[in-house]
Every structure is written in C-alpha cells, then in structure tokens.
C-alpha cells in the first residue's frame, strides 16, 4: 500500500467512528440489522460480532473450488477497492489482505452460491473467512485450515470493526476477476489466431492478395 492509500483508509475510518458517536442516529448495517431487520438496533458491544456473523452467514458457497489464479485476482481487486478509502475499514484489515496476496495465502472460494443482490456476497464471504481465522486457505500448494496457517506464520485473526463485514462482502471482485482473466486469455488467443492463420495460409500455399489493404478499402 502507498502512503496515500494508507492515509485515505485511516481518514475514512476516523470519519465513520465520528459519525457513530451519536447514538441517536442509526446507521444501516452498522448500528442496525440487515434487510428486514433494519429497524433492530445493535448495541455498541455487539457491533464487531454483527460483522463477523454477516461474513459467516454468507459463506455458503458450493461446487468446485475457484482456480488459484482467479483467487489472486479477487484479492488484488478487493485490495484496490478498499485502498480508495471509501469503505470505512480499518487499516489492519487491508494490510492483512495484502499480506495474503504477497505470501500466496489464497482463501478457498467456491464457484457456486453467490446471492448477487449487493455483489458477489458468497464468494467474498469465503475470501474473508481466513481474516477471522476461519475457513480454509491454499498455502504452498496445500489446502489447510486458515487458523493453522495463521498460527504457523505468527498472525493473529483480525477482529472486524463496525461496517467491515459489509465492506468486505459488497463488491463485484469475484465476477470482475473472471472478467479480467477472460480478457487476458482472449487477447492471447486473438494473437495466436492471427499467427496460426498466417502459418496455415502459408502451409496451403494460399494467396495473399485478398488481404491487401486496397481490396478491403474497395469492399468497404
């Protein structure tokens, strides 16, 4: 993270903390429940637990595991999003995601089960579980409990602060990662297709006149 990104993250978190100093003004999903429970107040001693429960309750993915290269892209895109300083997360949470990315600690995410209402909720919940010492990660080619890997590396689980569960789960990093991956491969395939086509034309002793610029200018 750059110094500017760190400053933005800290500044946004401080702003949120100031807004929460007024208990008379409820803030959706922070001092209230979610969805139909939006009129239920949440006490200050339960704010962290609310966010942790949000992550755990949405970690309901099924199917095959998401490939490792896609998970790395998910982490990168989530880090980029949070680094803009608009999400209200604590700096430690973003730094831990950066550490996961740099050390190759890849959360186990599943391909099916996303709710999709506010983004890729289920996949991003699975991405977030290892921050709490929950779920599984792929580390050095092995799938292991995240708590075990964190302990091995001397890392303590993150204690989510108010709003952090929302910030981690809301977003489109899962589908965006697949989109980026597909675009990269499409560009490579496009280049290969040109080379393969040229070699095939040469192998069959084809004529190159149909490819001249002048021909296509006339046809246009």
Give the ranges of each region predicted by the language model.
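Conserved, well-structured ligand/cofactor-binding cores
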Residues: 1-220
């Amino acid at each position: 993270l750059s110094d500017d990104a760190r400053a933005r993250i800290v500044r946004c978190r401080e702003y949120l903390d100031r807004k929460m100093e007024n208990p008379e003004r409820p803030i959706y999903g922070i001092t209230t429940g979610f969805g139909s429970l939006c009129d239920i107040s949440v006490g200050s001693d339960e704010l962290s637990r609310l966010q942790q429960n949000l992550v755990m309750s949405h970690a309901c993915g099924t199917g095959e595991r998401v490939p490792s290269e896609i998970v790395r892209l998910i982490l990168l895109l989530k880090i980029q999003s949070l680094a803009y300083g608009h999400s209200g997360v604590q700096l430690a949470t973003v730094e831990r995601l950066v550490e996961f990315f740099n050390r190759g600690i890849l959360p186990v995410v599943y391909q099916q089960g996303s709710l999709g209402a506010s983004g890729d909720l289920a996949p991003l919940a699975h991405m977030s579980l290892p921050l709490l010492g929950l779920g599984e990660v792929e580390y050095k080619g092995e799938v292991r409990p995240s708590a075990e890997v964190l302990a091995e590396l001397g890392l303590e689980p993150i204690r989510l602060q108010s709003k952090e569960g929302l910030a981690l789960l809301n977003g489109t990093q899962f589908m965006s990662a697949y989109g980026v991956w597909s675009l990269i491969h499409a560009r490579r395939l496009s280049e290969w297709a040109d080379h393969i086509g040229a070699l095939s034309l040469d192998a069959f002793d084809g004529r190159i006149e149909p490819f001249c610029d002048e021909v296509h200018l006339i046809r246009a």
